[in-house]
């Protein structure tokens, strides 16, 4: 806690050098000018809403990064808050980029149809015969140790969609958690201590971010031929460098600073590690804004005819009017799309006003976000509900088995008590069969009665011969046996 207090005191007392603030401010102005120009250019040629609404979200990532980095550079005490907001928009930009690629294919339905078509073709040949089969996604090392090859199918699209959206959800939740922990002084950014919240959130975020990037890379690898008309490699590399290289750049700066290897005059003038990172990001975003003008231009949309809500993809072979379109041949073709023709709609004006375009970006894009977030949460909750249901069923089954076992045990115990009881009573004393004559044979009974009478008589008269013959070393007195002296 003392280190955290000293850090806040240093951040409050520290101010960036004038030359650093001036240079970062110049790049900020350049970034805002070029990025806003590109955004308004897309809004003025807003003829393909399904693509452009998400493309604008990707373009706005550059000015957002630049503004937050400049604010953190000028006032280091809010660097944690700025970094959290920057990370939140990073996850949103990744979602927009994934949605943009899907829209360029023709939407979710056409993307799923494309994957089903490629997946059906992969069934025709064994998996080991063709290493570069299009319908199979093979994982690189070390992911191949944990995951089996993925076959293109609607399931694959759902995995990619879930992987990208989960990062946006987890990033937002961890950002809110970090703000709460920072308010209580237990966030400790950059410190790996058991009592700090930073290492735990960092582990969760790194895993979520890595999985989202992996899903995006696999989706790009599966659809790059279908996306050839938009030159996806340049767009993908530009986006990936902004999102992920900036993060690894921050890790490298922190590592070099902790090892004492940052001994340049510029690094020493920028005392805090976050200030070095913010200064570099301001310069990088100025360069990225220039690259965006060439990678995400609005000119292709301006050349389109009427505005359309969806896209129809046909092959260049059918551009001739004399050749009728064969839907089956188009569906089964493996070649990428070359000509994209819009639906003619005479009731819709060609283009929209900037106000209408902005409303569609926020409202229309928000509808997609809500739908995808609901889908992701459902996909995450349903397995948990099924697991809980199965667990409850197992507990109920175990309870029933225990009750059944106890019931059988009690029944066996009762049966054993009944079977252990003697079939004949062993009676002694006055109930002795020798005295009462319990034998069923009447002759024997009469003989015993006769002997009993003779015994009584002999005992009273002093004669002992008959008693000795009947009972050996015993004699009877009354109804009891006694030993003979």
From Swiss-Prot:
Assigned keywords, A-Z: Cell membrane, Coiled coil, Cytoplasm, Membrane, Transmembrane, Transmembrane helix
One Pfam family of this chain: Solute_trans_a
Composition bias type Polar residues, residue spans: 455-469
Keyword Membrane included in the entry's annotation: yes
Membrane topology: Multi-pass membrane protein
InterPro entries documented for this protein: Ostalpha/TMEM184C
Biased composition (Basic and acidic residues): 403-416, 476-485
Effect of residue 360 to N: In laz1-4; Altered subcellular localization and reduced activity
Record topological domains on the Lumenal side: 41-53, 189-196, 263-277
Residue ranges, annotated region (Disordered): 400-485
A GO-annotated cellular component: membrane
Coiled coil: 384-415
GO biological process: negative regulation of brassinosteroid mediated signaling pathway; programmed cell death; vacuole organization; vesicle-mediated transport to the plasma membrane
SMART domains: Solute_trans_a (SM01417)
Leader sequence segment: none
Topology feature Cytoplasmic, residues: 1-19, 75-167, 218-241, 299-485
This protein's record includes keyword Coiled coil: yes
UniProt subcellular location: Endomembrane system; Cell membrane; Cytoplasm, Cytosol
Transmembrane segments: 20-40, 54-74, 168-188, 197-217, 242-262, 278-298
Disruption phenotype: Suppresses acd11-dependent cell death. Laz1 acd11 double mutants survive throughout development to flower and set seeds, in contrast to the fate of acd11.
Functional summary from the UniProt entry: Required for programmed cell death (PCD) associated with hypersensitive response (HR). Involved both in the induction of EDS1/PAD4 mediated HR and in accelerated cell death in the acd11 mutant. Not required for HR induction elicited through pathways exclusively dependent on CC-NB-LRR resistance proteins.
Family under the similarity heading: Belongs to the TMEM184 family.
Name of the molecule in the record: Protein LAZ1
Gene that specifies this protein: LAZ1
